[in-house]
From Swiss-Prot:
Its main location: cytoplasm. The modification N-acetylthreonine is found at residue 2. The modification N-acetylmethionine is found at residue 1. It catalyses: 4 Fe(2+) + O2 + 4 H(+) = 4 Fe(3+) + 2 H2O. Residues 11-160 form the Ferritin-like diiron domain. This is Ferritin heavy chain. One of its GO terms (biological process) is intracellular iron ion homeostasis. The modification Phosphoserine is found at residues 179, 183. Stores iron in a soluble, non-toxic, readily available form. Important for iron homeostasis. Has ferroxidase activity. Iron is taken up in the ferrous form and deposited as ferric hydroxides after oxidation. Also plays a role in delivery of iron to cells. Mediates iron uptake in capsule cells of the developing kidney. Delivery to lysosomes is mediated by the cargo receptor NCOA4 for autophagic degradation and release of iron. It holds the Pfam family Ferritin. Fe cation 1 binds at residues 28, 63, 66.
Amino acid sequence: MTTASPSQVRQNYHQDSEAAINRQINLELYASYVYLSMSYYFDRDDVALKNFAKYFLHQSHEEREHAEKLMKLQNQRGGRIFLQDIKKPDRDDWENGLNAMECALHLEKSVNQSLLELHKLATDKNDPHLCDFIETHYLNEQVKSIKELGDHVTNLRKMGAPESGMAEYLFDKHTLGNSDNES
């Protein structure tokens, strides 16, 4: 095994930023893994909420893309990618749509907090490129995602979820089923 040679392209890229990017990559991959678990839970024959499954599968792919974008940045800046083990989701049974949406909301807020801390680190290390990258590619999208999930949680509660199975069915069919046409 060869040791990594020093980068020719590295400039104004602090080691703390490099390490924080590697941690963010892991967090984005973890989020992707959680959403993948949610997707296939809702795809089960005894749950059968196909639009919840599609929604969470889409979220999983987005989180993986976020990780890949950070990997590309790491290479562009002359950093080195060090992947860590991805923690398994805290549960395998997501119980119902409301619970899954609440967990997703909590997850997105955690990812957002980590991005805000990464932005602060980049500011402290006087790295305008990293600040701009995070602002351009992540922060606005996180805020939109948090708002969307918050709206979903509110609407599911208003419809009587989780006590009413009909609420989840209607939400799956009419809200998530029509989301392909919006975005």
